[in-house]
UniProtKB/Swiss-Prot annotation:
Family designation: Belongs to the glycosyl hydrolase 19 family. Chitinase class I subfamily.
EC nos: 3.2.1.14
Name the record gives this protein: Endochitinase 2
Gene Ontology molecular function: any one: endochitinase activity
Species assigned in the record: Capsicum annuum var. annuum
GO biological process: chitin catabolic process; defense response; polysaccharide catabolic process
Reported function: Defense against chitin-containing fungal pathogens.
Keyword Hydrolase: yes
Keywords of this entry: Carbohydrate metabolism, Chitin degradation, Glycosidase, Hydrolase, Hydroxylation, Plant defense, Polysaccharide degradation
Catalyses which reaction(s): Random endo-hydrolysis of N-acetyl-beta-D-glucosaminide (1->4)-beta-linkages in chitin and chitodextrins
Length: 13
């Protein structure tokens, strides 16, 4: 999804 975009400063991949 597009939640961690603002949740975490680092990219998931």
């Amino acid at each position: 999804s597009a939640i961690w975009f603002w949740m975490t400063p680092q990219s998931p991949k």
